Amino acid sequence: MNLQIIRSEPGHKDEIINLYRNIADISDGIIRCRDEITDEYVSGFLKNATERGLSLVGIVNNKIVAEIHAYTPNIFAFQHLLTDLTIVVDRDYQGQGIGRKIFERFLDIVKTELTHIYRIELYTREHNLRNVRFYESLGFVNEGGQKDKIYVSPMVFETPVHMAWFNPIYMKKE
């Protein structure tokens, strides 16, 4: 399999929408429901990531099969972080190392090009130990849970854990 990883572009929007909708109904997947994957949502995070963060796509055989993004909030006190990190891999390509490769490339770009970024943040469901271990293997630290923050249905909630990665070359110039 030949995986190409490049920066996201506005022209990728429709393919990214389809990718997100394709995986939105996977149990323990992304937090958004299928009907919340809108043009406005994807356009919004692509704009934010392009202007104040980073978004990458993974392409196999001219098809976008993965996407990762995070961005800096438009708040002075948070200028050192990327947050709302989301990563998706097409269900037909999961388990093939694509998620790890695109995530590692993302972190490499932060270390080499975005050295003003000290911290990257994400949430994952506490009970999804596979994801927790995956993020820990990339260097993320579990900063604790937020009890019952995720609404599932009346009287059914889930606890996400907040995880952070710290840039080992923060503010170092070559």
Identify the meaning behind each predicted range.
Residues 3-18:
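A short beta-loop-alpha structural element at the N-terminal edge
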Residues 57, 86-95, 124-125:
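A short, internal acetyl-CoA/4′-phosphopantetheine-binding micro-motif in the GNAT/acyltransferase core
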Residues 24-44:
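Conserved GNAT-fold acetyl-CoA-binding loop/helix
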Residues 89, 95-109, 133-137:
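Conserved acetyl-CoA-binding loop-helix of GNAT-fold acetyltransferases
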Residues 121-124, 136-156:
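Conserved catalytic-core motifs of GNAT/GCN5-like acyltransferases
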Residues 110-124:
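Conserved GNAT acetyl-CoA-binding A-motif
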Residues 57, 63-72:
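Conserved beta-strand in the GNAT
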Residues 45-57:
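A short helix-loop-beta-strand connector motif used in the catalytic cores of GNAT acetyltransferases and
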